[in-house]
C-alpha cells in the first residue's frame, strides 16, 4: 500500500515512495511518486494514504477493499494526483512532522580475520554486524538470553529486526563479533535455505490452510537426512494461505498453502512460486508453476537443488534460463 525506500540523493538522505502495491489475491507492484520524501515527513504520507482510502476505498466488497484496486480503477496518473491532493492537505496542517536526529557511532573498531556468511563488515573501520536467523523465526529463549547477556557489557550495540525473521547485532568490534558468532553458531540458519521465511501457519493461524512451519522443518530435515549442506538454493518464503504473510510472491522460491485432491482424498499441498524479486528497478512477481503435495515437497526441493548444482549457476540465473526444466520437475511430482 505504501513503501519507503532509503536513498542518497546528491548527499541528501531521503526516501523514494511507492504507493498502490500489494500482495495476496491479485497482487500488484506499486508505482513510484515523482518527488522524494524527507524522513521527518513520513507520517504525513501515512495519514495521506489513510485519507485517500477513506474517500476512495470500496466499502461494499471486502475482497476489493485494498489500495491496489483504487489504483487499478483510477489509473496511475489520476491515482498519484489524488494522493498528492491528500498529502498537500495533511502537510498544510503541519501536525505530523517528526524531529529525527541521526545517531553516529563513534566506537573504536578492531579488525577480525574471521570469515563467516553471517558476518557483515560495516562502513565504520573495524566494526561489524552479526546476523542471527532463528529457523522459521522461532527463537529459543535460552539463545536470546545468551545474546542479551553477552551484549550487556558491550558499548553502543544495536539490534535490528529484519523483514525476513532475522536479527542484526550491530556495532560490534572484531573480538565482540567473534564472540557473538560463537554464541549463535548452530542455533539458527547458516545457509540461505536454513534462513528461509515462514509465517506461523496452521494450527496457530485461524485462517491458514497450510502448516508452513512444519513444511519448513520437513524440508530442512530432508536435506539433513541426505547430508546435503551445499549453499545452493535460496531462502524459501512460505505462507500458509494466499495472504502472503511469508512474502512468497516476491521470493525466488515461494510456497503458499493449498489443498489438492489425490486418489479422491483432499491432501495438504502448496502452490509453487519461482523467481519473484523486489529489488529497486527490478521488482516482479513470481511465476506460478503448479500445486505440489506437501509430503512430496522436501524431495522436490532436494532434486531442484541437484539440478541447480549441476548447471553450476546462481539460482537467480537458473530460474531465468531453465524454466522448462523447472516445469518438467514439477510435472514429475504431479
Language-model features, listed with the residues they occupy:
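Small-residue-enriched alpha-helical segments and adjacent helix-cap loops
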Residues: 1-12, 44, 134-265
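Short glycine-/aliphatic-rich beta-strand segments at the starts of folded cytosolic domains
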Residues: 27-32, 118-138
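Radical SAM enzyme core and accessory elements
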Residues: 311, 316-334
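Terminal amphipathic helices with adjacent charged low-complexity linkers/tails
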Residues: 54-117, 171-178
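Short, flexible, solvent-exposed loop/turn segments with mixed acidic/basic and small polar residues
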Residues: 55-60, 119-124, 155-161
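Short amphipathic beta-strand starts and helix->beta connectors
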Residues: 19, 52-54, 113-118, 149-156
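Structural signal for hydrophobic packing residues in well-ordered secondary-structure cores
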Residues: 46, 50-57, 83, 87-91, ...
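Mobile "lid/hinge" segments at catalytic clefts and subdomain interfaces of large enzymes
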Residues: 1-81, 251-313
Amino acid at each position: 500500500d505504501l513503501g519507503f525506500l532509503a536513498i542518497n540523493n546528491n548527499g541528501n538522505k531521503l526516501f523514494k515512495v511507492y504507493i498502490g502495491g500489494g500482495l495476496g489475491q491479485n497482487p500488484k507492484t506499486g508505482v513510484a511518486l515523482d518527488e522524494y520524501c524527507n524522513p521527518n515527513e513520513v507520517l504525513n504520507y501515512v495519514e495521506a494514504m489513510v485519507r485517500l482510502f477513506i474517500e476512495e476505498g470500496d466499502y461494499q466488497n471486502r475482497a476489493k477493499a485494498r489500495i491496489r484496486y483504487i489504483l487499478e480503477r483510477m489509473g496511475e496518473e489520476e491515482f498519484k494526483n489524488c494522493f498528492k491532493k491528500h498529502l498537500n492537505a495533511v502537510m498544510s496542517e503541519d501536525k505530523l512532522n517528526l524531529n529525527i536526529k541521526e545517531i553516529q557511532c563513534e566506537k573504536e573498531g578492531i579488525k577480525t580475520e574471521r570469515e563467516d556468511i553471517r558476518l557483515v563488515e560495516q562502513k565504520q573501520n573495524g566494526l561489524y554486524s552479526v546476523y542471527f536467523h532463528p529457523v522459521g523465526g522461532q527463537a529459543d529463549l535460552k539463545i536470546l538470553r545468551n545474546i542479551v547477556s553477552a551484549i550487556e557489557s558491550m558499548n553502543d550495540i544495536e539490534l535490528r529486526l529484519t523483514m525476513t525473521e532475522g536479527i542484526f547485532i550491530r556495532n560490534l568490534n572484531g573480538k565482540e563479533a567473534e564472540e557473538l558468532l560463537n554464541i549463535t553458531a548452530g542455533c539458527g540458519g547458516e545457509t540461505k535455505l536454513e534462513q528461509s521465511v515462514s509465517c506461523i501457519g496452521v494450527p496457530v493461524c485461524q485462517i491458514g490452510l497450510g502448516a508452513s512451519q512444519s513444511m519448513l522443518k520437513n524440508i530442512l530435515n530432508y536435506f539433513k537426512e541426505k547430508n546435503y549442506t551445499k549453499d545452493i538454493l535460496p531462502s524459501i518464503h512460505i505462507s500458509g494461505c494466499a495472504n502472503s504473510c511469508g512474502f512468497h510472491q516476491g521470493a525466488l522460491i515461494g510456497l503458499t498453502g493449498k489443498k489438492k485432491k489425490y486418489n479422491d482424498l483432499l491432501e495438504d499441498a502448496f502452490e509453487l512460486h519461482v523467481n519473484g524479486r523486489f529489488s529497486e528497478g527490478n521488482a516482479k512477481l513470481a511465476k506460478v508453476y503448479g500445486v505440489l503435495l506437501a509430503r512430496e515437497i522436501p524431495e522436490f526441493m532436494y532434486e531442484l537443488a541437484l539440478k541447480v548444482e549441476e548447471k553450476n549457476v546462481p539460482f537467480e540465473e537458473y530460474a531465468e534460463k531453465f524454466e522448462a526444466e523447472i516445469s518438467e520437475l514439477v510435472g514429475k511430482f504431479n
